[in-house]
Amino acid sequence: MTLHSNSTTSSLFPNISSSWIHSPSDAGLPPGTVTHFGSYNVSRAAGNFSSPDGTTDDPLGGHTVWQVVFIAFLTGILALVTIIGNILVIVSFKVNKQLKTVNNYFLLSLACADLIIGVISMNLFTTYIIMNRWALGNLACDLWLAIDYVASNASVMNLLVISFDRYFSITRPLTYRAKRTTKRAGVMIGLAWVISFVLWAPAILFWQYFVGKRTVPPGECFIQFLSEPTITFGTAIAAFYMPVTIMTILYWRIYKETEKRTKELAGLQASGTEAETENFVHPTGSSRSCSSYELQQQSMKRSNRRKYGRCHFWFTTKSWKPSSEQMDQDHSSSDSWNNNDAAASLENSASSDEEDIGSETRAIYSIVLKLPGHSTILNSTKLPSSDNLQVPEEELGMVDLERKADKLQAQKSVDDGGSFPKSFSKLPIQLESAVDTAKTSDVNSSVGKSTATLPLSFKEATLAKRFALKTRSQITKRKRMSLVKEKKAAQTLSAILLAFIITWTPYNIMVLVNTFCDSCIPKTFWNLGYWLCYINSTVNPVCYALCNKTFRTTFKMLLLCQCDKKKRRKQQYQZRQSVIFHKRAPEQAL
């Protein structure tokens, strides 16, 4: 005579439904077992009774009180940190406009998935571990599994989207960034969630209806179609190993591209310093004259430097020898020198900008110098090579074209009666804007045709050169800022990817081992591995804070409740500025 408990026992005091059994074998007990009620060591506090299906109704699942306290405390802290951290991410995105970038939209989606895991998955799985059985019924079990797997797979899909976004942003900055809008980011995020839902939710919720029966035993909770190790192995390959492989390859490409751009920027800065030194006009003695030989030597130096860098430079050389009446006119030679340098500087800036946009075409820069007597337009336009220069023969008076195909000679009269033979090397400059010379000369015969530029004075050419160097420095600064942003984004991606691999790998390794040896891994290891996957949701907000200063300062502001103080300080500052303005207004009126 023995006793077995009803399956619907209370958690603390079970409702005992006694039945008398005439033999020990009827109860599944070994022979010789005393089948007297008093022979059982019944603990009313623990309620250790076995149901016919073999499940245990012990609310502590065979754990001691201290074990339960430790498990509940540790998992509770992790769940709380996960919830708070991801709520901080969502609220920070809401309150700080600086965080509303396309890249952070993906992080926002990832934070939503992590928040679901922290609120639902962690707590239910902890209850399952402590009680050592599922006590909430089949429907709650299937809903929990569906939410858990959809949110976890959405995290993986979001990481994939972030990796591809970073990769295309760095490798295709011109074409991809034009299409990289918040609307497109929302579409990508929506697709990640829809794909995750379609892959897991219907199969988990309705598989028992597809096959006609439910094979999950009472008191247990797992996905029915994953009961076969081979199916579990296949899902592990598709849900973890393939995404991790793709993300690792993409991150490696991102790292190599970032390193290459860093070297290019260093070379650009070095060439910029060298060009600035070479382009500086050094007066020699009492004259600033410069012969065509010196200009050709300078061009050869620049062409040699061109071979060692990725930035391609095209230079123009204009020189002339002053006539006997103009030997004392010091500014003529300096005009030639500075005109050469100004055009060269413009080409430098155009070439560096070409590297910035990552295009094979030449960026267009036009610098218009409106001078008292004339205006000069220097254009750097799209030309695939420097051999396509076409200059009208009527304007430049082409001489000896067959023998010297790389030089064009022309003569142009100016109002003081002097003439300047000009020699032009092959240029990537298409002279298409007529020079306005109405105030200065009688060269009206060139109306409607392209013409060569007039020589600039020393002061004017210096201004043009300074402007070109400033443009170059601005381009370099923009490239540096863009590179810094890309590095920060790559650091955030690397931290998230590393955390994902560390936390998800142990469980998926056990899945592979279980395919060949289903009894080699203890249940405790399974629980730890599964919980470690949840910890990834705890670590992600920490990665954002460590790698992004804006996130870090916003987190601090929210945790210290400084939002209202910041608004008040801003309002007080605006009020002070308004008072100062009103005080100064009467004084200025006087």
Curated annotation (Swiss-Prot):
Glycosylation sites: N6, N15, N41, N48
Positions on the Cytoplasmic side per record topology: 92-104, 165-184, 253-491, 547-590
One GO cellular component, as annotated: synapse
Bias (Low complexity): 334-345
A GO molecular-function annotation: G protein-coupled acetylcholine receptor activity
Database matches in InterPro entries: GPCR_Rhodpsn (IPR000276), GPCR_Rhodpsn_7TM (IPR017452), Musac_Ach_M3_rcpt (IPR001183), Musac_Ach_rcpt (IPR000995)
SUPFAM superfamilies found in the cross-reference section: Family A G protein-coupled receptor-like (SSF81321)
Residue positions where Phosphoserine is found in the record: S385
UniProt-annotated stretches for the region Disordered: 323-357
Membrane-traversing stretches: 68-91, 105-130, 143-164, 185-206, 230-252, 492-514, 527-546
Its membrane topology: Multi-pass membrane protein
Main location: membrane
Ranges in the topological domain labelled Extracellular: 1-67, 131-142, 207-229, 515-526
Motif (Basolateral sorting signal): 275-281
GO biological process per UniProt: adenylate cyclase-inhibiting G protein-coupled acetylcholine receptor signaling pathway; chemical synaptic transmission; G protein-coupled acetylcholine receptor signaling pathway; G protein-coupled receptor signaling pathway, coupled to cyclic nucleotide second messenger; positive regulation of smooth muscle contraction; regulation of smooth muscle contraction; saliva secretion
Swiss-Prot/TrEMBL keywords: Cell membrane, Disulfide bond, Endoplasmic reticulum, G-protein coupled receptor, Glycoprotein, Membrane, Phosphoprotein, Postsynaptic cell membrane, Receptor, Synapse, Transducer, Transmembrane, Transmembrane helix
Disulphide-bonded residues: C141-C221, C517-C520
Cellular localisation: Cell membrane; Postsynaptic cell membrane; Basolateral cell membrane; Endoplasmic reticulum membrane
General function of this protein: The muscarinic acetylcholine receptor mediates various cellular responses, including inhibition of adenylate cyclase, breakdown of phosphoinositides and modulation of potassium channels through the action of G proteins. Primary transducing effect is Pi turnover.
Family listed: Belongs to the G-protein coupled receptor 1 family. Muscarinic acetylcholine receptor subfamily. CHRM3 sub-subfamily.
Subunit description: Homodimer; the dimers can form tetramers. Interacts with NALCN. Interacts with TMEM147.
Protein name: Muscarinic acetylcholine receptor M3
Gene that this polypeptide is encoded by: CHRM3
